[in-house]
Each structure stands twice: as C-alpha cells, then as structure tokens.
Amino acid sequence: MAKAKFERTKPHVNIGTIGHVDHGKTTLTAAITTVLAKQGKAEAKAYDQIDAAPEERERGITISTAHVEYETEARHYAHVDCPGHADYVKNMITGAAQMDGAILVVSAADGPMPQTREHILLSRQVGVPYIVVFLNKCDMVDDEELLELVEMEVRDLLSEYDFPGDEVPVIKGSALKALEGDPKWEEKIIELMNAVDEYIPTPQREVDKPFMMPIEDVFSITGRGTVATGRVERGTLKVGDPVEIIGLSDEPKATTVTGVEMFRKLLDQAEAGDNIGALLRGVSRDEVERGQVLAKPGSITPHTKFKAQVYVLTKEEGGRHTPFFSNYRPQFYFRTTDVTGIITLPEGVEMVMPGDNVEMTVELIAPIAIEEGTKFSIREGGRTVGAGSVSEIIE
C-alpha cells in the first residue's frame, strides 16, 4: 500500500490524556484510535503499542511519551499519552507536548485520586486551556446515583483550580468495552470526540500570533548596520516593520527592520520557524545582545519576578544529588541565555529534593521578556538541574 499523503485540509489540534494511574488513560487512547479506525479516520493502535512509549529528550530530560494521530469529521488530532506519572509532570512542565486541551480520565469506580488533582493543578499552572472529562469504567458501576456523585466531585475539583467545572463536558463510558467492540460503549467514544471537537477551540496558529524572535547572535555589516539573527518563534516579520528589542535592560529599545535575510537571500517576509537575520535601523552593535528578543511593539514586556511550576531533575537524570533551599541562586536559561535568579520556596516548604515538582517564586537579576507559559531550564555550572514554566508574573 502506498504511503498516505498528509492532508492539511483540516485544522490541527494537540491533545492528550491525563489522570490518575490505572484509571484507563492508555486504554482510552487505544479505544479512540480503534473506534475511529472503523470510520477510516485513524490507524487502530493496541494498548501495548501505546504503552511501549519511546523515550525522548527535551531540555536534557528523558521523557517517555506515546504519540498517536487521528481525525474526526472536523479536525486532525495529535494525541499524547504518557506511561508514568513522572513522565506527565516532566512533559507538561517542559512543554515537550504542548496541549491545546486535555481529556481527563477518571475511573467511575474509584472517583478522583491524588494524581487526578495533581494533573488538574499542572494543567492550570502550565496553561492547558481546556479539559474534557471521560468518566471511565462506567460498566462496573450499576448505581446511577454513585455516577452522579463522582461527576459532581470531578466538577468541584476542576472549579477548585479555576476551570469552569459547571460547563466542562463529562462523558460517561467504558474504554475497555469500546475497545472490545461493544456498540453501546463505542457510541460513548464518538460522543467524547464530538465533545472534544466542540468544546476545545482550534488554537491560533503560531504564524498568526504577534511577532517574536529570540536573538541568538549579533554582528555589524559595515555601511549597512547591525544584524540580529535567530529563529522566528511566532508571527511574521516584513521589511519596514517596527520592532522592540526587549530584555536585559530596563527599557525596551524601539527600532525598524530595514532588511530580512534567510540563507543569504533577501526576503519580503519571514514567518514562524524561519532562521533569519534582521537588519535593524539606527542600532549600534553594543545596543543589542544574545538573550534579548525582537518583538512586535507592546506584545511582550520584560520582567524580573514571577511564580513558576518547576520539576527538579533526579541525580540519575544528571541533576543535583542534594536538596536545595530558599535563596538558592542558580542560572535560569530563557530561550538563548542564562540569567542568575534567586529562588523563594512557598511557605511551609523547607527544601526541594531531586525528583520533586514544586511551585516557587523567582527573582532575576536582569529583566527578561517573559509571559505566562514561558518555559525555561534551571542550570548550575552549565548542567541542567530543573525545568520550569512561568505560572504568574509578579513584576
């Protein structure tokens, strides 16, 4: 059979399954592919094909993640499923799998459990914007009232973490029965995917967001001016566009892009993903440096103090061997550069052990262009000891 061509006709959405261990995340992932395969919209994947997730490295951290893809009438989906709880924590904090929405799997027989709560909190902290609930194993619960009770508990838990618990779609089903081909339960998988189609909005494409490019290198071209190079992270850039140089100094510097080059050829416009050089009007070589960003004026601002959700590497992952305390001063690596910062742990948390996942407040010694959801690494003497995601800007 010839290899099928990837059709880019449908909008693309990234989703994933989250929830407590053994509540049925991987079985549900298998059931979705199997049910959709009958409509010719997916390749059926068995449980053990998904469970044997390959290891990947993201920011120096090893994470096991399974990726499957499938389609509905409306959209094309990339779906991530992680075998272990630690993989979810690392995945969400590093942004290895950026989710536009998540399917929270809760066993109707057990109700919400500790990792149910932790995954909802992580979703809130790292900016997973929408959650749809699949109450699994409903074939094992005969009591209708018990199902309603579990549903209420899940809705309350979502509301507690600022998700709209009353509005979130809750589908009651059985992933295993659907996987085995029981039509009554297969119908619930279709219902779930309809809810995902309708409730989780299609994300804005990177190209449509305001322009931003982290600066990797700077050089001057005699007679022409200063060029900043880097990979466009989002948006588009045209010759003549006004931009700001942001970070590492108190005030952003305004300038205009007078030329855009890619592979030594002149371009009219660059877009997200392109590696370019931008010629900056009236900027001297010493006014711009690696670690700053070029951005659409007013779209992103420099900050020094923020709250973040952080995963601390274990010593097996190449991290620290010992815990750290408040006032720890490592390097925070944002995009292209390291900046020293001082850590303050939350009240009641005395120290952080390797392998922990913790919220902390960070104060940088120089301002950096950041916003909620910006990812960073924590480094010590050049090696990565943690990974984080900005959850709230303080100043």
Curated annotation (Swiss-Prot):
This is Elongation factor Tu. Coiled coil: none annotated. InterPro entries: EF-Tu_GTP-bd, EF-Tu_GTPase, EFTu-like_2, EFTU_2, G_TR_CS, P-loop_NTPase, Small_GTP-bd, T_Tr_GTP-bd_dom. It is found in: Cytoplasm. Its main location: cytoplasm. Residues 10-204 form the tr-type G domain. GO terms for cellular component: cytosol. Mg(2+) binds at residue 26. The keyword Thylakoid does not apply. Residues 60-64 are annotated as: G2. It comes from the Bacteria. Residues 136-139 are annotated as: G4. Belongs to the TRAFAC class translation factor GTPase superfamily. Classic translation factor GTPase family. EF-Tu/EF-1A subfamily. It catalyses: GTP + H2O = GDP + phosphate + H(+). Its EC number is 3.6.5.3. SUPFAM superfamilies: EF-Tu/eEF-1alpha/eIF2-gamma C-terminal domain (SSF50465), P-loop containing nucleoside triphosphate hydrolases (SSF52540), Translation proteins (SSF50447). Keywords: Cytoplasm, Elongation factor, GTP-binding, Hydrolase, Magnesium, Metal-binding, Nucleotide-binding, Protein biosynthesis. One of its GO terms (molecular function) is GTPase activity. NCBIfam families: EF-Tu, PRK00049.1, PRK12735.1, PRK12736.1, small_GTP. Monomer. Residues 174-176 are annotated as: G5. Residues 19-26 are annotated as: G1. It is an enzyme of class 3 (hydrolase). It comes from Geobacillus stearothermophilus (Bacillus stearothermophilus). CDD domains: EF_Tu, EFTU_II, EFTU_III. Transmembrane segments: none annotated. Residues 81-84 are annotated as: G3.
